Amino acid sequence: YIWGAILPPDAANHRFTKTIHLYNFGYSLSILAFYIFPFLLTKKMKFKNFLDVFFKKNNLITFLFFGVYLISLIFFDNFENLTVLGKGIFHKLFLFVVTDSFYRLILTLITFFFSLIIILIYFEKKIDYLIISYFLLISLFIHPFMQEYFDPLILVLIFTFLKTKIKINYKNSFILTLF
């Protein structure tokens, strides 16, 4: 409780804005998916379970809202004027690898979509979705949005607080250590 808030003091005092930054929602999804992906590899899943994610009623509604979100990003926000600072590993990777901003936008939107899928596959309990929703909503008001805000917190939540449990055995510990 040294910070006195969920964000570092510098971010809480200077970076919490009254402007909504729509892209930060997707970037926070991609950062969460980056941390969740190794844990997803430890889950035993069948292909049928993977397909169920696309056909659950709640997830269909989520995909509908997410489609509206992606369309609003394309038409109502300016991708080219985003700052380089922050936004996580995928943003930095795409800046390094892709020079054309149109292709970078397409890759970013695809990353947002796959990040949503990873989160929907991994989490099983509604309370976990509520906790994750908090991070997604608060990211809309933080500028610039840094990956360091999630670094230790998401891992601590996964191991302790979240209801979706992981099974740690020799194979799973090797996978988690590798990442």
Task: Label each PLM-derived region with a short phrase.
Residues L40-V53, L116-K126, F161-T177:
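Membrane-interface junctions at the ends of membrane-embedded or membrane-associated helices
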Residues H21-Y35, F90-L116, S139, F145-K165:
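Hydrophobic/aromatic-rich transmembrane helices and adjacent perimembrane loops
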Residues K126-Y129, F145-P152, Y170-K171:
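Short, aromatic-rich membrane-interface segments at the entry and exit
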Residues F55-Y69, D128-L136, I166-F179:
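Signature aromatic-anchored transmembrane alpha helix within multi-pass, membrane-resident enzymes
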Residues I2-P9, I74, L120, L140-P144, ...:
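Structural signature of transmembrane alpha-helix termini at the membrane-water interface
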Residues Y1-H91:
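Membrane-lumen/periplasm interface segments of specific transmembrane helices
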